[in-house]
UniProtKB/Swiss-Prot annotation:
<feature type="binding site">
    <location>
        <begin position="62"/>
        <end position="67"/>
    </location>
    <ligand>
        <name>ATP</name>
    </ligand>
</feature>
<protein>
    <recommendedName>
        <fullName>ATP-dependent protease ATPase subunit HslU</fullName>
    </recommendedName>
</protein>
<comment type="similarity">
    <text>Belongs to the ClpX chaperone family. HslU subfamily.</text>
</comment>
<feature type="binding site">
    <location>
        <position position="350"/>
    </location>
    <ligand>
        <name>ATP</name>
    </ligand>
</feature>
<feature type="binding site">
    <location>
        <position position="20"/>
    </location>
    <ligand>
        <name>ATP</name>
    </ligand>
</feature>
<dbReference type="InterPro" id="IPR027417">
    <property type="entry name" value="P-loop_NTPase"/>
</dbReference>
<feature type="binding site">
    <location>
        <position position="422"/>
    </location>
    <ligand>
        <name>ATP</name>
    </ligand>
</feature>
<dbReference type="GO" id="GO:0051603">
    <property type="term" value="P:proteolysis involved in protein catabolic process"/>
</dbReference>
<dbReference type="GO" id="GO:0009376">
    <property type="term" value="C:HslUV protease complex"/>
</dbReference>
<dbReference type="InterPro" id="IPR003593">
    <property type="entry name" value="AAA+_ATPase"/>
</dbReference>
<dbReference type="GO" id="GO:0005524">
    <property type="term" value="F:ATP binding"/>
</dbReference>
<comment type="subunit">
    <text>A double ring-shaped homohexamer of HslV is capped on each side by a ring-shaped HslU homohexamer. The assembly of the HslU/HslV complex is dependent on binding of ATP.</text>
</comment>
<feature type="binding site">
    <location>
        <position position="285"/>
    </location>
    <ligand>
        <name>ATP</name>
    </ligand>
</feature>
<dbReference type="InterPro" id="IPR019489">
    <property type="entry name" value="Clp_ATPase_C"/>
</dbReference>
<keyword id="KW-0963">Cytoplasm</keyword>
<dbReference type="GO" id="GO:0036402">
    <property type="term" value="F:proteasome-activating activity"/>
</dbReference>
<keyword id="KW-0547">Nucleotide-binding</keyword>
Length: 472
């Protein structure tokens, strides 16, 4: 609740650190976020009646549509998913169905809840992980296995833990034969771990196979809300692999495993669904490409059919996920598109009505390019200065050089294809190509990028329309 309790002015001020201009769009999203907080302050009966006012952002590529939505979600710690409308297919065709965007949102919310829960038990998890590291670094001899009748009980305990989505708690300390020598060595290693003297030492650990987890997440049943891995996980234990890595890296893997044992997954799943329902943001990009005015080949799947499939989700419906049903009534949907070859009215009327707030983003001017290069927290020029700085070269840009870069970006955008701020990436890569290549072998410690330096390297390319079309 505290996270979304920000005034519209505070939200806009936070967005100003990352996105230049586009004040109208910033105001619109800030109001939408504040309305979420206002809704939560009302009675339960009134909360059900108030739905978010979904938004349609209209503007060319590279002007900040996606960045505004992405930064907005980070500011209020909301689950955020970006999808492309063109990736979906109409029900009945092979491909991703539109409901998968909601399931992706739930996955993001669950990871956020897990991180929050894990941070609460981290101190305990680190202690347990360090104990495991000590045993791995100083292994003891295994006792002779005895058939004492407890193996069946241990197997049933593991079965129960896996059914509840928990990592089986396998404690093999009772199977170790710890001599006085091993005990003393372990005490010494434990002390060295605490003081950080073994962080770069190599250790071999057993961990879940990440490839198996990735394969389980990509199956078609998962897209329908059925997790085959979860269903069979209790019968087929996770595949474990051995890897050798530094202690610092191994500790983080073991801390996560120990954290999983200390938290209640059922609570995490419930809280994640509530979070996704009330604070989730789904950004649907390229929605203009599924309109009647968009380019369509005769063999393409009906784009209007995709619109009709999106409609019930945006209107509010219940979607089945492997963690339980989720209601989309209060999820905020932000759609965006350039609408260069179509217009918003080409969307089906029902879908238009579900995006009542429309914001047109401005094209970027030369002054905007100058600000983009210098003002944001992690401005492009700051990024390149930091990158080249790793080669012990101090790079500085004169004001005239920055203005020359901005002028070239503006000119090339308007003479070829307008790709907005993304043009700056292309120009800076070409401009600094020699420094990035020669940097590690250069002896000079300082380089100043001047206007003449800019004109010498990319001025001629910018003047030639054919060259700039292919190079910049």
């Amino acid at each position: 609740m505290e996270e979304i309790n920000k005034t519209p002015k505070q939200i806009v001020a936070a967005l100003d650190n990352y996105v230049i201009g586009q004040n109208q769009a910033k105001k619109a999203v800030a109001i939408a976020l504040r309305n979420r907080y206002r809704r939560m302050e009302l009675s339960a009966e009134m909360q059900e009646e108030i739905t978010p006012k979904n938004m349609l952002m209209i503007g060319p590529t590279g002007v900040g549509k996606t960045e505004i939505a992405r930064r907005l979600a980070k500011i209020v710690h909301a689950p955020f998913v970006k999808v492309e409308a063109t990736k979906f297919t109409e029900v009945g065709y092979v491909g991703r169905d539109v409901e998968s965007m909601v399931r992706d949102l739930v996955d993001v919310a669950i990871e956020m809840e897990k991180q929050q829960a894990y941070s609460g038990v981290r101190a305990q998890a680190v202690q347990a992980a360090d104990k495991r590291l000590v045993k791995l670094l100083v292994p003891a001899q295994k006792k002779q296995a005895k058939n004492n009748g407890n193996e069946f009980q241990n197997m049933m305990n593991m079965f129960s833990q896996m059914q509840n989505g928990q990592t089986p708690n396998v404690d093999d300390s009772s199977n170790e034969e710890v001599t006085d020598e091993v005990r003393n060595q372990r005490l010494s290693v434990a002390d060295q771990l605490k003081t950080g003297r073994l962080e770069n030492s190599e250790v071999t650990i057993e961990m879940d196979d990440p490839q198996q987890a990735a394969a389980g997440n990509n199956n078609m049943l998962g897209q329908m809300g059925i997790d085959l891995g979860d269903s069979l996980g209790a019968l087929m234990p996770k595949k474990r692999i051995q890897r050798t890595m530094p202690v610092s890296e191994a500790r983080e893997i073991l801390v996560r495993e120990e954290s999983e044992k200390l938290v209640n997954n059922a609570d995490i799943y419930h809280d994640a669904i509530v979070r996704a329902e009330n604070t989730g943001i789904i950004f649907i990009d390229e929605i203009d490409k599924i309109t009647k005015g968009g380019q369509q080949g005769s063999g393409e799947v009906s784009r209007e059919g995709v619109q009709r499939d999106i409609l019930p989700i945006v209107e509010g419906s219940q979607i089945s996920t492997k963690y339980g049903p989720i209601n989309t009534d209060h999820i905020l949907f932000i759609a965006s598109g350039a609408f260069a070859e179509s217009k918003p009215s080409d969307l089906i009327a029902e879908l238009q009505g579900r995006f009542p707030i429309r914001v047109e983003l401005d094209d970027l001017s030369k002054d905007d390019f100058v600000k983009i290069l210098t003002e944001p927290k992690n401005a492009l020029i700051k990024q390149y200065i930091a990158l080249i700085g790793t080669d012990n070269i101090k790079v500085t840009f004169t004001i005239e050089a920055i203005e020359a870069i901005a002028t070239i970006a503006y000119k090339v955008n308007h003479e070829t294809q307008n790709i907005g701020a993304r043009r700056l990436h292309t120009i800076l890569e070409k401009l600094l190509e020699e420094l990035l290549y020669e940097g590690p072998d250069m002896e000079m410690g300082e380089v100043t990028i001047t206007e003449s330096y800019v004109n010498e390297r990319i001025g001629n390319i910018a003047q030639d329309k054919d060259l700039s079309r292919y190079i910049l």
